[in-house]
Each structure stands twice: as C-alpha cells, then as structure tokens.
C-alpha cells in the first residue's frame, strides 16, 4: 500500500508544468469543438446523463442555471465543498478514466478561457459543469467564434 499523501506532497516543478501543458491542450481542444458544434448537441462521455443527474442531486444549488453559468472558484475549494466533491468522485472513479486529472474550467459560460475566467479543477468537475451547461444550451453561443 502506498504511503503517498497528495495533501502534503511537494509539487515538483516539472510535473506541474506537464500537467499545465496537458490541461491547456484539453481546454484548447474543447474550445475548438465548441466553435464547431453547439454544446447542446455534444456528449462528453457515455455517462453524461448519469453525471448530470448525480450532479443535480448532490449539488442542488446548481439546479439554478445562473449558478451553473457563472460561479466562483472559491465555492469549489472550501473544506465543505471539497468533501462533497470527494463523495461525488467515488461514484465515477471506476467508470470514468482519468476522472481526477487536472483540467481547466471556465468559471463563466459566457466568456472564453482567460486569466480571470478559468480555474483548475478535477476532470469530473469539468464534466459536471460542462454537461450541465451543454444541456441548458449555455455554450451554444460559441459556435462560429474563433
């Protein structure tokens, strides 16, 4: 059994840079996809409906479309929020490959990825928000953008 503890581990600069490169590449790929296809027509995983239903059930505050559209990074990072998300992750940890990889998420669905509109999250959080945004048509405005 491993004794590695992610909460107390030192971040190695090279590993951090590699994660950042992958996260940026994923964000660029997703944005390019959204410029070509309305988000409301996309499926991000074969578990989209299950992710959405569990997200709405466990985080009922996001049934308010405005909260899905725009949120603050801080509301995802509180001690209570982290615990709620950990419980959400356990549902999908054996179903979604790389569910816990770092990913960039826009904090505002009406904006592009940018310095003040992007946060670093776990991929399953990205899926939860973006699937909800897509179901509500919040990303459809992006089609045709550059």
Swiss-Prot record:
Annotated compartments: Cytoplasm
- What is the scientific name of the source organism? Saccharomyces cerevisiae (strain ATCC 204508 / S288c)
Family of this protein: Belongs to the PBDC1 family.
Q: Which domain of life is it from?
A: Eukaryota
Q: Which UniProt keywords apply?
A: Cytoplasm
This entry's Gene Ontology molecular function terms read: misfolded protein binding; nascent polypeptide-associated complex binding; protein folding chaperone; ribosome binding; translation elongation factor binding
Q: Mention any additional remark.
A: Present with 37500 molecules/cell in log phase SD medium.
Look up keyword Cytoplasm and say if it applies.
Answer: yes
Q: Which GO terms describe its cellular component?
A: cytoplasm
Matching InterPro entries: PBDC1-like_dom_sf, PBDC1_metazoa/fungi, Polysacc_synth_dom
Q: Which residues form a coiled coil?
A: none
Q: Name one GO biological process term.
A: 'de novo' cotranslational protein folding
Q: What name is this protein filed under?
A: Protein PBDC1 homolog
